[in-house]
């Protein structure tokens, strides 16, 4: 993997994490956003980059590494965006979508919050590396099925003109 590909992966992961983090305080949507951040962020970023021709997965090793990078970066940006929004909402309008989590964000020391975010980031990297691995096999399965359905073109040797 070259630096350009890794930079694209990180940028799109940051964008996805911030979007998920900003939408997470909405009631009933927050749980779905957390599930997307924990499990589905690697397939989303990988499929987008593959369709945009910015990423080419050649081995399972690259898919696992890509999934781990996506998972960790999405979790860090998700956590920063979510903690910032919840701190602002809790201080200004006394809103809390999850009382225990909001209390922890507001009252805990920064180092403890950082350790918690990194711990969850490693968990998110692990689950997303597995989902990236599964995505690699699903993409290859679809490619193989597509190639089998296409008729094999014979060379133009079989083509003859009749008068």
For the regions a protein language model found, what residue spans apply to each?
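Juxtamembrane/disordered regions of integral membrane proteins
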Residues: 1-163
